[in-house]
């Protein structure tokens, strides 16, 4: 699988992910870009799960953003509804983290749209719990920037999770 983590701190939101694509117990690719910008660079997205499924969801989410003039929550809810109810989409296995300058969300195929705790940290994928734990500890105990926290959290997850590597893609937005 993978690790995607998002941290919002001091006027910045950062989403980062590793680059490993696995098929069973085999590493197929080590430098995949699982974090992207959508909607003219105003929205950051990262996926965990099937690569082909994620690209389908990226395209669909971008259409929802265009339809709702970039309103992140409305677009996420509409994507989650369609993902849950459409027969073809329901088979897609992936999770998304999406973020703009003001909010961050997780979108799942079960129709869930999850907002973060007060700490504004989100993580998904096989190494998500490791990255989430690391990010929370770093936010609480350091003055590191959001980007530095994402970098360190991905490194920790990559050191622990066999489905997460140390090749990272990181995108950020500032308020």
Swiss-Prot record:
GO terms for molecular function: metal ion binding; threonine-type endopeptidase activity. Keywords: Allosteric enzyme, Cytoplasm, Hydrolase, Metal-binding, Protease, Sodium, Stress response, Threonine protease. Allosterically activated by HslU binding. It holds the Pfam family Proteasome. Na(+) binds at residues 158, 161, 164. It is an enzyme of class 3 (hydrolase). It comes from the Bacteria. It catalyses: ATP-dependent cleavage of peptide bonds with broad specificity. One of its GO terms (cellular component) is proteasome core complex. A double ring-shaped homohexamer of HslV is capped on each side by a ring-shaped HslU homohexamer. The assembly of the HslU/HslV complex is dependent on binding of ATP. Belongs to the peptidase T1B family. HslV subfamily. This is ATP-dependent protease subunit HslV. The lineage of its organism: Bacteria, Pseudomonadati, Pseudomonadota, Gammaproteobacteria, Pasteurellales. The gene is hslV.
């Amino acid at each position: 699988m993978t690790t995607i983590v998002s941290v919002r701190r001091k006027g910045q939101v950062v989403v980062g992910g590793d680059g490993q694509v696995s098929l069973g117990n085999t590493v197929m690719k080590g430098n995949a870009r699982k974090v992207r910008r959508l909607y003219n660079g105003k929205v950051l997205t990262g996926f965990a799960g099937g690569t082909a499924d994620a690209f389908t969801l990226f395209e669909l989410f971008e259409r929802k953003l265009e339809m709702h003039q970039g309103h992140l929550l409305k677009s996420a809810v509409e994507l989650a509804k369609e993902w849950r109810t459409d027969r073809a989409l329901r088979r897609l296995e992936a999770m998304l983290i999406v973020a703009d300058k003001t909010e961050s969300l997780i979108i799942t195929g079960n129709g869930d749209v999850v907002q973060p705790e007060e700490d504004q940290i989100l993580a998904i994928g096989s190494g998500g719990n490791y990255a989430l734990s690391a990010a929370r500890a770093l936010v609480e105990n350091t003055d590191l920037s959001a980007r530095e926290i994402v970098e360190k959290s991905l490194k920790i997850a990559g050191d622990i999770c066999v489905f997460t590597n140390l090749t990272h893609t990181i995108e950020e937005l500032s308020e």
